[in-house]
Amino acid sequence: MSQAVYRWPKGSVALAAFVAGSIALLFAFAPAYRTAEAKTGLPLTAPLPDRVPPGVVLRVGDPVTRWVFEHNGWEKRLPFRVEWAEITGGPDVTEAFHAGVLDVGFGASVPPIHAVWMGIPVRIVAFREYADRATRQAYVFGIAPKANIKTLSDLRGKRIAFSPSQVQAQIVIETLKAVGIRRQDVTLVELPSSIGGDVYSNALASGAIDAAPIRADLVAQRYVRDFGARGAHILKHPPFRDDGGNVYVPETSLADPGKAAALRIFIHYWGLAQAWVNAHPEDVARGYYVGNRGLPIADARVMAAYTGNVSVPRSWAGAIAYQQAAIDTLGPETKHPRLDAATLFDRRFERIAGDAAASVQGKPS
């Protein structure tokens, strides 16, 4: 029987120390963040202001949305300034919120939950999901070349990458439950996927871990392309959802009337951006993934397909249930308290993005 412990792969000691130190500092100062939170300002129950005063700046971490805004000239229509940040991935967004350098972040199901667990109050202000979520997965399991894993049941006794602050953790726990493997019968290797490069793919290829949830986009394709001859392969996880994406913000930004008014407008355009990406996959491939990221066109098309074909619901009932499932899966496993998922959502924004996306869906561009 394998002991369920957290362990870093060989050769990652310095990186592990840095990440562990950052997380420790974040925990240490989380109470201070709560104490310092504005005690005055716009109540979260107040209607969203209509007027954006002069000088308002929104700091946003969402590179694809930035390209869509710039490509369409939408920034010129905004009565406020957007400062774009190259910040992606739940841990980085949480750190940026804690440091007070970001107003808007994008992440999957777990990052906003984890932020609240760490004492950083955030609210979800927009949600998207796969339009074809019944047949499409955002993540698959990468299997190391010599792991001798043919089916998910073979994960028993293996080393699996685990990042408690990211959706990958939820995928691991739900998969183990679905195939009847107890957590103590595997070794969970704590390894954030956002610490740079293809960290999961490299750890798999080197044999430091046996399995890891990796994105079902170019990451998975490259992994099989580069290491398939050595026996590397991928497996789909059981049929549970992994597709939700959240726009979330610190409550301190919502307490600022000017920023709250700007967020109302920004989320409208964010909804337009989702519809635009759906309708223009080739533009996204060539303009963003080739032009900005330097990918070959074939790889760029893979990424554009992964980014697109999303739906922006006008009701958050399904989104709340989706987030609650993540809380109920990870809370007991990570020793965090149960949350009511509805409290994560700012319902004042519920229809804004969905109405915007619906207003242009299917219209000629």
Show the residue positions of the predicted features.
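N-terminal hydrophobic or amphipathic helices and topogenic motifs
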Residues: S2-E83, G90, A321-S365
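Secondary-structure end/capping motifs
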Residues: D256-H336
